[in-house]
Amino acid sequence: MYARVKDSVGGNAFSAFQIWGPGKTAKVQCDISANLSPAMFRRFVQPYLAAQCEWLDFSLYHLDGTNALQQVEPLLEVPRLNGIEWTPQAGRPGGGDPCWFDLYRRIRRGGKSVQAVGVQPGEVIPLIDAVGPEGLYILVSGAVDVRTSEMLMRGIEAYR
Protein backbone atom coordinates (compact mmCIF):
# COMPACT_ATOMS: atom_id res chain seq x y z
CA MET A 1 0.00 0.00 0.00
CA TYR A 2 2.78 2.45 0.91
CA ALA A 3 4.28 2.01 -2.57
CA ARG A 4 0.99 3.25 -4.02
CA VAL A 5 0.50 6.30 -1.76
CA LYS A 6 4.03 7.67 -1.41
CA ASP A 7 4.85 10.87 -3.23
CA SER A 8 7.87 11.65 -5.41
CA VAL A 9 10.16 12.12 -2.38
CA GLY A 10 8.92 9.01 -0.57
CA GLY A 11 6.58 10.83 1.79
CA ASN A 12 2.90 10.51 2.38
CA ALA A 13 0.11 12.42 4.09
CA PHE A 14 -2.67 11.56 6.49
CA SER A 15 -5.09 14.29 5.56
CA ALA A 16 -7.63 13.83 8.37
CA PHE A 17 -4.98 15.10 10.80
CA GLN A 18 -3.19 17.30 8.28
CA ILE A 19 0.18 15.59 8.70
CA TRP A 20 2.85 14.79 6.11
CA GLY A 21 6.20 13.13 6.54
CA PRO A 22 9.14 12.26 4.29
CA GLY A 23 8.51 8.54 4.70
CA LYS A 24 5.83 6.20 5.98
CA THR A 25 3.61 8.54 7.99
CA ALA A 26 0.39 7.67 9.80
CA LYS A 27 -1.96 8.45 12.64
CA VAL A 28 -2.29 5.54 15.08
CA GLN A 29 -4.95 5.12 17.73
CA CYS A 30 -6.85 2.88 20.10
CA ASP A 31 -10.11 4.56 21.07
CA ILE A 32 -11.02 1.74 23.45
CA SER A 33 -8.06 2.92 25.55
CA ALA A 34 -10.56 5.12 27.41
CA ASN A 35 -11.96 1.90 28.90
CA LEU A 36 -8.63 0.29 29.80
CA SER A 37 -6.45 0.73 32.84
CA PRO A 38 -2.85 1.74 32.12
CA ALA A 39 -1.78 -1.82 33.03
CA MET A 40 -4.23 -3.29 30.52
CA PHE A 41 -3.13 -0.76 27.90
CA ARG A 42 0.50 -1.75 28.44
CA ARG A 43 -0.37 -5.44 28.12
CA PHE A 44 -2.87 -5.46 25.26
CA VAL A 45 -2.22 -2.31 23.22
CA GLN A 46 1.30 -1.04 23.77
CA PRO A 47 3.11 -3.98 22.07
CA TYR A 48 1.04 -3.62 18.91
CA LEU A 49 1.30 0.15 18.95
CA ALA A 50 5.08 -0.14 19.33
CA ALA A 51 5.20 -2.55 16.36
CA GLN A 52 3.22 -0.11 14.22
CA CYS A 53 5.54 2.74 15.18
CA GLU A 54 8.60 0.61 14.41
CA TRP A 55 7.32 0.06 10.86
CA LEU A 56 6.46 3.72 10.35
CA ASP A 57 8.95 6.52 9.87
CA PHE A 58 6.63 9.07 11.51
CA SER A 59 3.69 8.40 13.80
CA LEU A 60 1.09 10.51 15.58
CA TYR A 61 -1.18 8.98 18.24
CA HIS A 62 -4.80 10.17 18.34
CA LEU A 63 -5.59 10.62 22.07
CA ASP A 64 -9.35 10.95 22.13
CA GLY A 65 -11.11 12.47 25.15
CA THR A 66 -10.44 12.95 28.83
CA ASN A 67 -11.25 9.31 29.66
CA ALA A 68 -8.17 8.32 27.66
CA LEU A 69 -5.79 10.64 29.52
CA GLN A 70 -4.68 7.80 31.82
CA GLN A 71 -2.77 6.43 28.82
CA VAL A 72 -0.37 9.36 28.48
CA GLU A 73 2.42 7.66 30.48
CA PRO A 74 2.14 4.35 28.59
CA LEU A 75 2.21 6.31 25.33
CA LEU A 76 5.34 8.19 26.37
CA GLU A 77 6.99 4.78 26.88
CA VAL A 78 6.64 3.86 23.17
CA PRO A 79 10.11 4.70 21.82
CA ARG A 80 9.29 5.27 18.13
CA LEU A 81 6.04 7.16 18.70
CA ASN A 82 6.79 10.67 17.47
CA GLY A 83 3.83 12.67 18.68
CA ILE A 84 0.47 12.78 20.43
CA GLU A 85 -2.56 14.60 19.09
CA TRP A 86 -5.05 15.65 21.75
CA THR A 87 -8.77 15.80 20.97
CA PRO A 88 -10.94 17.02 23.87
CA GLN A 89 -14.42 15.55 23.63
CA ALA A 90 -17.58 17.57 23.04
CA GLY A 91 -18.48 19.80 25.95
CA ARG A 92 -14.85 20.37 26.94
CA PRO A 93 -12.73 23.42 26.14
CA GLY A 94 -10.94 23.33 22.78
CA GLY A 95 -7.30 22.43 22.33
CA GLY A 96 -6.05 25.99 22.84
CA ASP A 97 -7.58 26.41 26.29
CA PRO A 98 -5.07 26.91 29.13
CA CYS A 99 -6.52 23.90 30.97
CA TRP A 100 -4.57 21.66 28.52
CA PHE A 101 -1.21 23.43 28.79
CA ASP A 102 0.08 21.11 31.54
CA LEU A 103 -0.84 18.10 29.39
CA TYR A 104 1.09 19.52 26.45
CA ARG A 105 4.13 20.28 28.61
CA ARG A 106 4.00 16.75 30.04
CA ILE A 107 3.97 15.25 26.54
CA ARG A 108 6.85 17.51 25.44
CA ARG A 109 8.88 16.60 28.56
CA GLY A 110 8.30 12.97 27.57
CA GLY A 111 10.08 13.60 24.28
CA LYS A 112 7.03 13.59 22.02
CA SER A 113 5.62 16.29 19.78
CA VAL A 114 2.11 17.65 20.39
CA GLN A 115 -0.66 18.37 17.93
CA ALA A 116 -3.17 20.78 19.47
CA VAL A 117 -6.51 20.82 17.63
CA GLY A 118 -9.49 23.11 17.94
CA VAL A 119 -7.29 26.12 18.71
CA GLN A 120 -8.90 29.51 18.14
CA PRO A 121 -6.82 32.29 16.54
CA GLY A 122 -6.63 34.28 19.80
CA GLU A 123 -5.30 31.21 21.65
CA VAL A 124 -2.29 30.57 19.40
CA ILE A 125 0.23 32.98 20.97
CA PRO A 126 -0.73 32.20 24.60
CA LEU A 127 -0.39 28.48 23.77
CA ILE A 128 3.06 28.94 22.27
CA ASP A 129 4.10 31.17 25.20
CA ALA A 130 2.96 28.53 27.70
CA VAL A 131 4.26 25.39 26.01
CA GLY A 132 7.07 26.63 23.77
CA PRO A 133 7.28 26.39 20.00
CA GLU A 134 9.45 23.28 19.71
CA GLY A 135 7.51 20.14 18.86
CA LEU A 136 4.18 21.95 18.76
CA TYR A 137 1.82 21.60 15.80
CA ILE A 138 -1.26 23.81 16.08
CA LEU A 139 -4.44 23.31 14.06
CA VAL A 140 -6.43 26.53 14.10
CA SER A 141 -10.20 26.02 13.99
CA GLY A 142 -12.87 27.93 12.20
CA ALA A 143 -12.79 30.30 9.29
CA VAL A 144 -9.73 32.50 9.45
CA ASP A 145 -9.82 35.58 7.26
CA VAL A 146 -6.80 37.16 5.57
CA ARG A 147 -6.41 39.84 8.24
CA THR A 148 -6.42 37.26 11.06
CA SER A 149 -3.98 35.05 9.15
CA GLU A 150 -1.59 37.95 8.66
CA MET A 151 -1.87 38.88 12.34
CA LEU A 152 -1.05 35.28 13.33
CA MET A 153 1.92 35.16 10.98
CA ARG A 154 3.32 38.36 12.48
CA GLY A 155 2.68 37.03 15.99
CA ILE A 156 4.53 33.77 15.47
CA GLU A 157 7.48 35.33 13.65
CA ALA A 158 9.32 35.82 16.96
CA TYR A 159 9.28 32.03 17.50
CA ARG A 160 10.91 31.08 14.20
Name each model-derived stretch.
Residues 1-160:
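Active-site loop segments of alpha/beta catalytic cores
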